A protein has these predicted regions:
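Extreme N-terminal leader/targeting segments of oxidoreductases
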Residues: 1-36, 111, 169-172
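Feature captures the FAD/FMN-dependent oxidoreductase FAD-binding
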Residues: 1-3, 103-169
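N-terminal Rossmann-like FAD-binding beta1-loop-alpha1 element of flavoenzymes
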Residues: 32-62
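A secondary-structure boundary/capping signal
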Residues: 40-43, 65, 126, 158
Length: 172
């Protein structure tokens, strides 16, 4: 992890204080900050870039309009498998298990996406859509409007927006 493995002694001694789960909830909520990078789409490309940026210490939020990470794959035709062999589809930092089939079934891959996001501690909002994005040249920041599952909207100001919404999807 190139020296990025965190060492947290505080939670071991303060049994009534915040623990890892509390800190993850706060990190994912983005209540008091904006991400440096907003990644639109949380499948292969989106999760991979979020993992790479996170390992570099870049505060990154990935969003996906699906209810669960991987649902874009779960909804596809029943017998779908990847058309490329497992060995060329590994994710950064966590290769697929050696016991996996050569051609990964869609549901297995979708479940991996969820597992990967959790294991890599990626900040992901599901059931969230990008409604609008405008770039402010003077501030060198984007203004993005995100629509959450409950219908609420959230305005954020990331420095960068990365579109990973798939080869068949066009931004609106």
């Amino acid at each position: 992890a190139n020296g990025r493995r965190w060492q947290d002694v505080d939670w071991k001694r303060n049994f009534g204080g915040e623990n890892w789960a509390d800190r993850r909830r706060q990190a994912i909520a983005y209540e008091d900050r904006d991400p440096a990078v907003l990644v639109v789409g949380a499948a292969q490309a989106g999760l991979m870039i979020a993992a790479r940026l996170s390992m570099l210490g870049v505060d990154t939020l990935a969003i996906d309009r699906e209810k669960r990470i991987g649902d874009s794959w779960r909804r596809r035709y029943h017998a779908l498998t990847l058309h490329n062999e497992t060995r060329v589809n590994h994710f950064p930092y966590m290769p697929f298990p050696r016991s996996w089939p050569v051609l990964i079934p869609k549901d297995m891959l979708a479940n991996w996406f969820e597992f990967y996001a959790e294991a890599m501690e990626l900040n992901v909002w599901t059931a969230t859509e990008l409604v609008a994005a405008t770039y402010d040249e003077s501030a060198k920041r984007w203004t993005v409007i995100l629509k959450r599952a409950d219908g609420s909207e959230r305005i954020m100001h990331p420095r960068h927006v990365v579109f990973c919404n798939g080869v068949s999807t066009l931004p609106k």
